[in-house]
Amino acid sequence: MNPLCSEFTSSSRKAPEAAIGQVLIEALPYIRKFEGKTFVIKYGGSAMKDELLKNSFAQNVTLLRKVGINVVLVHGGGDAITRTAEKLGLVSQFVHGKRVTDNDMITVVQMTLAGKVNQDIVRLLSEHGGKAVGVTGLDADTIKAVPGPNAEKLGLVGDVESINTDYIDLLCRAGLIPVIAPVGYDHNGNIYNINADDAASSIAIALKAEKLIYVSDVEGIQVGERILKTICKAEAADFIEQGIISGGMIPKVLSAFKTLDGGVRKIHLIDGKFTHSLLLEIFTHEGIGTQFIAEQDNDQQENR
């Protein structure tokens, strides 16, 4: 063997091995800290479409469960619903980003979210060693709904009235990963399409979760050229007033702080377009996205 080649190969292996070791050491206190805690993860965006990202996400979720964290997954599926509707000759319409849902469309929503999308996620987690169970908001009154405030325009789009935390806790105690499709029904048996972000927030509050994590297509809250590592409520209000946070990011930020007000300790916004972004956000000091905290606190700022 060429000595020069041998030396080059050996040295090139040391750097990544050291880096992996450092990440594992850095993760250890977080693993201890979060054992037995509950994380609610809203799964959406590119991480649901790209095969590499899907597998990376499934590996991350499975690892969280294996180290003793209770993971509750709430998923979207808007693109899949639109595709199914098109195949059936239905046109998708939206008002302020929410899908107009009539009787035909709610059937498509149920069929796509509870059937195809939900079961695909369960299968993917199972392939990576996770014990997942598919749940819809209709199962065991997991999500009880009420008509939304704009029912005359949106139709069967609902808001969350209550969450059956006993059922979700039962699944978590059994070592399972509940994968929840965001549909629910009211006291009259009417079925509603529920925004996945809103459902995840309500579930996190009801479960008194340690964290709510939004896996999306944005890197976090951007101010100028940088992504904020941490933002508190007062800072967010200032940024909104100054126009630094604007457009579609405003409702996301307001929803995050509403969830904090409901008792969830931290909210995280991370970019699902990066492989293993979930682990990098949770188990490293720097994180990869933006964490939302109720107020400035050095301990909360410095740790994920």
UniProtKB/Swiss-Prot annotation:
A molecular function (GO) term: ATP binding
Gene3D superfamilies noted in UniProt: Acetylglutamate kinase-like
Annotated positions for site Transition state stabilizer: 42, 252
Binding site for substrate: 77-78, 99, 193
One cellular-component annotation, GO: cytoplasm
Stored CDD domains: AAK_NAGK-C
Iron as UniProt keyword: no
Keyword terms of this UniProt record: Amino-acid biosynthesis, Arginine biosynthesis, ATP-binding, Cytoplasm, Kinase, Nucleotide-binding, Transferase
The EC number(s) this enzyme carries: 2.7.2.8
EC class: transferase
UniProt entry tagged with the keyword Nucleus: no
Domain of life where this protein originates: Bacteria
One Gene Ontology biological process: arginine biosynthetic process via ornithine
Database matches in Pfam families: AA_kinase
Reactions catalysed, as given in the entry: N-acetyl-L-glutamate + ATP = N-acetyl-L-glutamyl 5-phosphate + ADP
NCBIfam families: argB (TIGR00761)
Function: Catalyzes the ATP-dependent phosphorylation of N-acetyl-L-glutamate.
Family, as annotated: Belongs to the acetylglutamate kinase family. ArgB subfamily.
This protein's name: Acetylglutamate kinase
Protein's organism: Chlorobium limicola (strain DSM 245 / NBRC 103803 / 6330)
Gene name, Swiss-Prot/TrEMBL: argB
